[in-house]
Amino acid sequence: MVTDKQIAIVTGAASGIGRAMTLGLLDAGVDVAAVDRNETGLAAMAATVHDKMGTMQTIPADLSQQSSFDTIVSAVLSRFGKIDVLVNNAGIGQASIKPDQRRNPIRFWEITPDQWQRFLTVNATGPIMMARAVVPHMLRVGKGRVITVTTSLGTMVREGYLLYGASKAAAEAAMAVLAADLRGTGITSNVLVPGGVTNTAIVGDDAGDRARMLQPEIMVPPLLWLVSDAAAGITARRFVAMDWDASLPGAQAAEKAGVPIAWLGIARMPVEPAT
């Protein structure tokens, strides 16, 4: 459980996984700064949260713009005075380019330089720059949580998924570096993924029966554990939401659903030269 009033930033909060995580945090009593470029979507969500235990601040922002990061942090600090949790969720999928991209994959030679740059900017640079803006404020108090939504390993290397897969892989590798850089500071960096095709706008029109997909709310139980006191020492891990067993105590569920971040469990680290 959360034992004191926490302040969280959730990016990409107006729909899909971001919306589900925002509502889950609010239900748990966490105050949330909901960030999204979709101002209409933020307003619609804000109209539905009056009965929640937490309060919500809406911040319309485009994370492809470098000026957005400090603006977001300043707005949150002005409203709440601190930041305890950053949830990097904002992202774009290949269905934004080709709605039938599962049936007709986007081959790497078909992508444009502008498309490549946009996916890197939103899916990889955005989480890094958001953390860069937030973490100094966490360092001052010696605690904080950075939680980043990436994607399944299979998606990272899937045929026709260079734009999405590689940009999400870059984000996860970056979060592994964050975990290493932040070791001993009281600030953790972990990755959370659904574990399968999820009913969001990221997937295209040809993804199949949405009722049979994972639903965004699957992310809430592991997220709430990650922001709880019980997860204070947990860092450099990747948690798969579909493997989270909510019937188990949190630590056991985390052990079952977690693996080392960024494939560290399946690759041998290089031997460093002696110093």
Spans of features found by a protein language model:
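Canonical Rossmann dinucleotide-binding motif of NAD(H)/NADP(H)-dependent dehydrogenases/reductases
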Residues: 2-33
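Conserved glycine-rich Rossmann-like NAD(P)H-binding loop of the short-chain dehydrogenase/reductase
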Residues: 30-45
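Catalytic loop of short-chain dehydrogenase/reductase
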Residues: 107-115, 145-170, 175-176, 180-184, ...
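A short, exposed helix-loop element centered on a Lys and neighboring polar residues
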Residues: 131-132, 176
